[in-house]
């Protein structure tokens, strides 16, 4: 059954159905036309406040004289959302422009509702952020404070901790820990006092320990020197090779005061024998340049040398005597010659 658009029955049916659909908070109707209530309508629900009536057209109708659509502002004043009687009404400023939030460089996190008691009284109204449109006044006093642990309050203790210039003293670190953790303040104080007492107790003990150690080490060193000397003497008596090494070390320690230790060029001679051994061998060489086997064995036993060492020493001494005699002869000959 089709009704023409000019008939009032069709319009009333269309309007009533759309009003019932819109009051049931459904913005999309099943019919072919869409209706939104006028701004003057009293509606308890919050919704889009556009108004207008768009009737449906038949297939063959192009224009109609009664057809029209009244367009109203899409978002009216926010005051019409709620009744003035309600307690949750939000007062709006005159201008609808959202104020720009101007944050200072030092952003204080403590200006929120969860504020400490010591800073609440000092708060100035200018420091409250410009969200007065949403929050008309600061937090009421009835709200309980949120307990914030001590490690969240670093801003109060950072300045004091920074002035210590990163000292390595345990007292400074204990004070910083006291400021950072106010709950355990009594425990670090006791620990700091204990540290001071331990320092005082450790200082004299540490001062006495090095002296004791030095006293213990010095007798050991003093006692070790004669022991080493006696061991060296025993080894020298037992083996002539070790004795030769010992003689080299003694010669290296002694200054070259005598001529028999130094050569003509000033360098130190290679002398594997001790002074006592060389003196005994020199005496025997003055008596006899050539030794028999029996005499060589006797000298080797008296000087603690082997038979072969005594034999080599006499051979070297004879070669040295020949060289010295040759040099003396040449020197005498050159001194007598005169060059014209």
UniProtKB/Swiss-Prot annotation:
GO terms for biological process: regulation of transcription by RNA polymerase II. It comes from the Eukaryota. Gene3D superfamilies: Homeodomain-like (1.10.10.60). CDD domains: homeodomain (cd00086). The modification Phosphoserine is found at residues 238-239. GO terms for cellular component: nucleus. Coiled coil: none annotated. Pfam families: Homeodomain. Residues 266-325 bind DNA. It is found in: Nucleus. One of its GO terms (molecular function) is DNA-binding transcription factor activity, RNA polymerase II-specific. SUPFAM superfamilies: Homeodomain-like (SSF46689). Residues 199-227 are annotated as: Disordered. Residues 208-217 have a biased composition (Polar residues). Signal peptide: none annotated. Sequence-specific transcription factor which is part of a developmental regulatory system that provides cells with specific positional identities on the anterior-posterior axis. Belongs to the Abd-B homeobox family. This is Homeobox protein Hox-D10. It comes from Pan troglodytes (Chimpanzee). The gene is HOXD10.
